[in-house]
Amino acid sequence: MNKNEVKTYLLKKNTFQNISITKDAIEQILFLINLNSDNIGIRLSIKKSGCAGFRYSMKLLKASELKKEKDEKEVSFFYQNILIYIYSKDIPFLEGIRIDFVKNNINKIFKFYNTKLEKFCGCGESFSIN
């Protein structure tokens, strides 16, 4: 396998409710991926952080960061020409999310929306898990 090839597999039907990404977010993600030829996609995850306990994370994924062999603890799929990697343990918290790229005062930021989560901190940046 050369360094630009990526091993992927499709999720079984009815095991993952697709995420949705707005047009503005897709355009920005593709723009960021194309800034560096080693970028191949994004990794979505949750991290311990914030006053409520967890926050969503999205980072650019480089070909050089991928393991040679497929990791059974993660899934990968394409969404509108964006290669997305998710750790299996994070899937329950990422199912059904909507990612947008919005103007926040003078900045533009990625915003994650999940109607399944019930507890958020006051600023909306973190959430808790029951």
From Swiss-Prot:
One of its GO terms (biological process) is iron-sulfur cluster assembly. It comes from the Bacteria. SUPFAM superfamilies: HesB-like domain. GO terms for molecular function: 2 iron, 2 sulfur cluster binding. It holds the Pfam family Fe-S_biosyn. Gene3D superfamilies: HesB-like domain. GO terms for cellular component: cytosol. Belongs to the HesB/IscA family. This is Uncharacterized protein BU122. It comes from Buchnera aphidicola subsp. Acyrthosiphon pisum (strain APS).
